[in-house]
């Protein structure tokens, strides 16, 4: 019974983190679709705040043993790659 509860908590934690990551990914995708300026202070502030918040959530879940460190790194890494692609696309548009 206790292992079922732990497993359930782990699944819920991962699902919640993935949902938060998806929100950030959607924000990135909207920016990619419109190629709005990534240097816009509001844009940077929102994404930085969201990414920082998610990184803290991931760290907390890892420390509780709800997700593995590898899962957390993979989740954040995917978002960082998308951000990098956005900046690259915008830079290419400017040239």
From Swiss-Prot:
Which SUPFAM superfamilies does the protein's record reference?
Answer: EF2458-like
Taxonomically, the superkingdom here is Bacteria
Record-annotated disulphide pairs? none
Q: Which InterPro entries match?
A: UPF0358, UPF0358_sf
Concerning its family, UniProt says:
Belongs to the UPF0358 family.
Q: What is this protein called?
A: UPF0358 protein BCE_3996
């Amino acid at each position: 019974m206790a292992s079922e509860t732990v497993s359930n908590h782990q699944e819920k934690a991962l699902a919640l983190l993935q949902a938060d990551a998806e929100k950030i990914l959607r924000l990135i995708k909207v920016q990619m679709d419109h190629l709005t300026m990534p240097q816009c202070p509001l844009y940077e502030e929102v994404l930085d705040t969201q990414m920082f918040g998610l990184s803290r959530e991931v760290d907390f879940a890892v420390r509780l043993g709800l997700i593995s460190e590898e899962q957390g790194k993979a989740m954040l890494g995917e978002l960082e790659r998308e951000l990098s692609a956005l900046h690259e696309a915008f830079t290419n548009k400017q040239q």
